[in-house]
Amino acid sequence: MNSLKAKKGLGNIVTGLFNQLVTIALGILIPRLILTSLGSEANGLLSSVNQVLAYLALLEAGIGTASMQALYGPVATGDRNAVNRIMAATHHFYRRTGFFYLLAVLVCAAVFPLTVRAEGIAPWQIALVVLFSGLPGAVNYLFQGKLRLLLLADGKKYVLTNLGTVTFVITSLSKILLLHLGFGVVELQAMYCAVNLLQIGFVCLYMYRHYRWLDAKAQPDYAAISQSRNVVIHEVSTLIFNNTDTLILTWFCGLASVSVYTMYAMLFGMVTTLIGNFSSANFILG
């Protein structure tokens, strides 16, 4: 049992490190290509939209973290009945979260073009960028979110990391091709949306093949994830600390300033994440 856990932990470390190296390499290249091909306004728009969507993640209300913590015990002891009950409770909340997330994305798609001006980008294009950027998040909550939590609790973070790396590489190469062919920011985000929806489908397929014992009709154990209210307080403070700066720049300084700022912030964030991966207990817990 300990050797299996160590093997999973090592796999998480190796795949996590490789993912970070790929992310750093392509994360530097792609924004530069967007800047040279579409301009700083387009790059700033993408950064601003991502920050808005980060705030929508608060709709989860800490359910994800609370559910994963609740799953560690039953997964370790092999109590499938308890796992199914926790998963059923998580699904109930995630389904509601997905509905409100989708509604919020639609509202943002309608409002964001009215509050942000981008030179060379029409309001309808801004709306589509918001829609294509946010749709995968809604689908994630509706169909995949609870499945990812079980993989993490089961020490199989490397599965998600490998899939995330492949998805990121495909998305990045597709962006390079689309930019070379002269497509705009809307087409880039439409492609991003399509690739991420395929990723969600792959996770669902993986879970169907390897976790056939999951019972969607199990009696929900809401008490097991009752600590979500305590978790959300920490998530709010972290989100405000990490994401407020870009939104303030968006509304008061314009998208061109956002583009410059996020380039430096991105590099700092990559280095911070890379260092954090070595000290994080996630590699041991999965």
What residue spans do the PLM features occupy?
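Interhelical loop/hinge segments that connect adjacent transmembrane helices in multipass membrane
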Residues: 1-9, 185-189, 201-243, 247, ...
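Signature of the first transmembrane helix
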Residues: 7-73, 102-108, 132, 167, ...
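Membrane-interface helix-capping segments at transmembrane helix termini in multi-pass transporters
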Residues: 7, 38-46, 78-88, 99-137, ...
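Membrane-helix boundary and inter-helical linker elements of multi-pass secondary transporters
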Residues: 36, 152-153, 180-181, 251
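Helix-loop junctions and terminal segments of transmembrane helices
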Residues: 61-77, 152-153, 211, 268-286
